[in-house]
Design a protein with these regions (language model features):
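A detector of single, family-specific signature residues
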Residues: 1-403
């Protein structure tokens, strides 16, 4: 039986079913079939692949559009079988379809396009960026990725609820918000949720107020002063329960976020990338956990420029003729970029040399965000070198201070 160097598999990922095409490096398509996103569908997929591997020999390479999305857990199962996994760059795939259009458009045609991309990469080096091999990542970084994304979703939910609750409070009970500088304060939320009826808060005695968690004599005095002039709108009877429900949900979210951060702290201590990021002044636990989770492994980046583009700290040349300009890249991890922007802003306030560079960029007419990204471009070089060498950040004295 003839042997080949590789069995190539292309998967067009859908919501409930995926379209699969299996072929050889010669371009021959061996089989096409649909795969249900169920355990029995996964078993059928691997049975088909293993049958062709026994027949033709060689390794198995699997390419899928939508890695780490709707394809989960199929992508994890592919890697657990020892197959090489490639992520199809969907933007470059769209450009490929424009250059080599098909007669029609359906899932099976898209799956065959994946096999064509394999062949194109063999003969055209510039096309290798279309198929990006997925590097193995440490388990702790995979866990950090899921936990930090979960935390971010809860933080955003808390922000939405706070905005809604404050607007409802301002309408239903004018003046109540003035007793606190932040509606997210624990004592204020405990005060709101003490009773099922919002209007009863105006009649609570001082002894009852002091029994509420977080309220001492200072806050009790503020509440007592508000009670003397408390006023409720006509719709407080049905808006009040909504406010109390939102306040209780915010308390639940606070506890859930705190628990996630504690879990992240334990994983950061095990992650080499997170430890390195955490050693940079200004990059705290949350920033280090988010960046480590989104990067996964530094092995996926060929150089520091690739890392900078991925984290949104670098622009692409967009010059033509005498025009000199740049544009923002589209392949940016927005979560990693957000964590970098927060960490860099805190970093420059703690490191005088970074602050001087930031002020230099502002003096050149750059906006705050542009100056932060310019500083982040330099930090990406430092981070890439740190992670490659397994070193932590070293804060050294400036030359003029040593002299």
């Amino acid at each position: 039986m003839p042997t080949t160097s590789e069995i190539r598999v292309s998967i067009d990922v859908g919501c409930h079913r995926h379209s699969v095409a299996i072929g050889l490096p010669t371009g021959e398509v061996l089989e096409e079939f649909d795969l249900l996103h169920r355990p029995e569908g996964f078993d059928l997929f691997f049975a088909h692949v293993e049958r062709y591997q026994r027949r033709y020999g060689g390794e198995v390479a699997v390419a899928m559009e939508g890695y780490n999305g709707w394809a989960r857990p199929l992508d994890t199962l592919v890697r657990s079988h020892g197959y090489r996994l490639f992520n199809i760059n969907n933007l470059k795939l769209a450009r490929f379809k424009e250059i080599f259009p098909a007669a029609a458009k359906n899932d099976r045609i898209d799956a065959r396009k994946g096999l064509e991309l394999f062949q194109l990469c063999d003969h055209l080096p510039v096309a290798r960026g279309v198929l990006q091999e997925v590097a193995a990542t440490p388990l702790e970084n995979d866990q950090l990725k899921r936990l930090t994304r979960r935390r971010r979703a809860l933080v955003e939910e808390r922000s939405r609820l706070l905005c809604r609750m404050q607007a409802d409070l301002q309408a239903a009970c004018p003046g109540l918000l003035t007793i606190t500088q932040n509606a997210d304060n624990l004592w204020f939320l405990n005060f709101l949720t003490h009773s099922q009826d919002l209007s009863k808060l105006a009649r609570l005695r001082e002894a009852t107020l002091l029994g509420i968690k977080g309220i001492g004599r200072k806050y009790a005095a503020l509440i007592t002063a508000w009670q003397k002039s408390a006023h409720f709108s006509h719709d407080v009877a049905w808006v009040g329960p909504m406010i109390i429900e939102d306040a209780r949900r915010i308390l639940e979210l606070r506890a859930a976020i705190k628990a996630l951060e504690a879990h992240c702290a334990a994983l950061v201590a095990q992650s080499e990338i997170a430890q390195g990021i955490d050693s940079i002044p200004g990059f705290g636990l949350v920033c280090a956990a988010e960046i480590a989770g989104e990067l996964g492994t530094v092995a996926r980046f060929a150089n520091e420029g690739s890392l900078a583009v991925y984290m949104g700290m670098a622009t692409l040349d967009n010059s033509s003729g005498q025009y000199r300009g740049s544009k923002n890249p589209k392949h940016v991890n927005t979560r990693a970029k957000a964590a970098m922007m927060v960490g860099i802003d805190r970093h420059r306030k703690q490191v005088p040399e970074s602050q001087r560079y930031y002020e230099k960029k502002r003096a050149q007419g750059k906006t705050h965000n542009q100056a932060i990204r310019a500083l982040g471009r330099h930090l990406c070089r430092v981070i890439f070198s740190m992670l490659k060498q397994g070193r932590c950040y070293e804060l050294r004295e400036a030359k003029e201070n040593r002299d």
